[in-house]
Amino acid sequence: MKKEKIIVIVGPTGVGKTALSLQVAQQLKGEIISGDAMQVYRHLDIGTAKVTPAEQAIAPHHLIDVADIDERFTAFNFQQQGQQLITKITDRQHLPLIVGGTGLYLQALLYDMTLGSATDAEQDFSIRNKWQAYLEQHSETDLWQALAKIDPDAAAKIPAANTRRVIRALEVYETTGVLFSQQKPKELRYDTFIIGLNCERPVLYERINQRVDQMVDAGLIEEARWAYERRATSPQAVRGIGYKEFFPYFDGECSLEAAIDQVKQNSRHYAKRQLTWFRNQIPVNWYNLVEHQEADLARIQEDIQTWLQK
């Protein structure tokens, strides 16, 4: 059976994913599925760099604003809804474009990972809650060492600061009995062309810093306060970068400048982790639209046409 064709656009913040996705969607009758774990939440717009209503009017967008802040939206939910959307979009003879940077979500969709049923998702959530409670009482290093005892190979590849990934590795082992490091990706579910956008590290970091300043000017602090006031009932949604860093400021424990600097630092670290994950986990074709826009845009268009004709 012939596989459905999809294009995936990945990369850290500030490298041109949105602009490229809109251009490709216009040229190829595409519909865009957000692959970002935080953009599913209503009202979290600025901190998640959500596409604007004007941008959404250019091409159909999906999996944006589909959950309230107090709802859980898991990789299982994304996988199920994403697969259904790909089938519907393909049936309309349009091209699905997956745009975003949440590694586990993309992997679950592209490789058809077995994530279990809704009941299993509930079990995952209880295990996740257990380790998050552990983290509140212990250090990141303690959490990482708990993983290292069970799965040293996974721990060697996951930095202690990436607590979400560490907890996910612990979840996988406790749920399935299979070590996270021994999970082998299956064959790609779709006929997939993956575009990775990046630029030189100093340029990327400067763009991230500028992006954070622009978000602050656009009202990020007010949005973070809105999330802060709902943090007790929204543990998953308020963990996103761009929100949690302001909580100490709201509590009077640090200055606004320090909170903004922390957002910038965490955003830079996250971008570095994203790039490492993309290089190691999925077959990406890399381009630089920041420093080589004209040449690489032409190369992208040529490579897409070659792939479409296969």
Curated annotation (Swiss-Prot):
It catalyses: adenosine(37) in tRNA + dimethylallyl diphosphate = N(6)-dimethylallyladenosine(37) in tRNA + diphosphate. ATP binds at G11, P12, T13, G14, V15, G16, K17, T18. Its cofactor is Mg(2+). Keywords: ATP-binding, Magnesium, Nucleotide-binding, Transferase, tRNA processing. Substrate binds at T13, G14, V15, G16, K17, T18. InterPro entries: Dimethylallyltransferase (IPR039657), IPT (IPR018022), P-loop_NTPase (IPR027417). Signal peptide: none annotated. GO terms for molecular function: ATP binding; tRNA dimethylallyltransferase activity. It is an enzyme of class 2 (transferase). Pfam families: IPPT. Monomer. Belongs to the IPP transferase family. This is tRNA dimethylallyltransferase. It comes from Latilactobacillus sakei subsp. sakei (strain 23K). The gene is miaA.
